[in-house]
Amino acid sequence: SSAASDVYKRQVHEGGTYDKYTVKDIKSRDWSIVYDGSINCYNANGDRASKSYSVEMNSPVLEYGDIPLLQEVVRALRKAGGVTGPRYCAGTHIHISADDYTPQQIRNLVNIFASKEDFLWDALQVSSARESYYHKMDKQFIEEINRKKPKDMEEIKGLWYHGRMSEQFQHYSNSRYVICNLHSFFQHGHYEIRAYNGSLHAGEVRSQIVLALAISNAAMTKKYCSPHVSQSDNMRYSFRVWLLNLGLIGDEFKNCRTHLLKHLDGDIAWRHPEDGIAARAKLKEKREAERQAARGQRVEPVSEVQELNENVSDENSEPTESECENFEEDEEMGMEMSM
């Protein structure tokens, strides 16, 4: 495709500790393939493979408008025989620039993850095989950052490392293995989201990025985000409402919502499923009454399609079960944000 052609085919083997290969795109940005020893190696046939299969792709710093290019790169990897996913202990790690965050915005950010991490664990189908490489948020850190309400980043840093400040200079600090990694922020100015399973489905990858950016936007724009852990007996409805509150509204984000909701159980249109059952029963009674009246008056009955259109919830922002099958992403983008 024209987007994929934006990445040159010529590779450069730089070698080094991670046996690095790089490919430049037309903007002279490096896309890298590097060794990653944490991956379980299988080939495309599912057979055990050598460590030459133990690699990951690192993109350059991208902006929102680069997502179509990233999607084409993902498709090219899949077409070339690349494999990834929970079985391989592989994940998608997304780094978000946060060098202009205030202490309150960092507090908002970690509170969002602390409050919604149970939802995210289910929605993202977090693999148990990867639990060695990230956990839920540190409850002691969340309690202290909300009790002390730090006003500067150094104080937040002290809370993050629990006073063990030498860890900030260690690349593999144990503090990095959480759903929202601030160790990366203190070292490089960007935090890391580690919750996503690896995927070579371009639509899933886009939905992962869009959710990460929406959470970032909420952390920056909301005055205060509570750490109170969200609970629900209708996860699909509650998670959908949260996505809409994050701004993932309308056709632009419909496909993202579909991917993010497709693993959740529950009634998407009704907070209490029994209300949906009652509403459908009432609609059925209404249909039958109208049919009886139509037969008595010898007129055509109201069509079932018309009845459904008049009585069901607006679908404009609600993915249905059928939309979750054989789905491919749309590629129309709107806003522009840095990643």
Q: Which residues does each PLM region occupy?
A:
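Non-Sec secretion/translocation targeting segments of pathogen effectors
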Residues: Q306, D314-N316, E321-M339
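Long, highly charged low-complexity segments enriched in Glu/Asp and Lys/Arg with interspersed Ser/Thr
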Residues: G250-G296
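Polyanion/phosphate-binding surface patch
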Residues: H13-E63, A76-R78, V83, A90
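Helical (often loop-to-helix) elements that flank the catalytic cores of nucleotide-handling enzymes
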Residues: S5, D66-V74, A98-Q125, N146-M153, ...
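Histidine-centered divalent-metal-coordination microenvironment in nucleic-acid enzymes
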Residues: A3, G85-Y101, H188-R194, R240
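Short, small-residue-biased leader/transition segments that mark boundaries at the very start
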Residues: S1-Y8
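Aromatic/basic-lined ligand-recognition segments
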Residues: R29-D47, I106-N197
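Flexible helix-coil linker/hinge segments at domain or subdomain boundaries
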Residues: G85, D118-K136, N217-N234
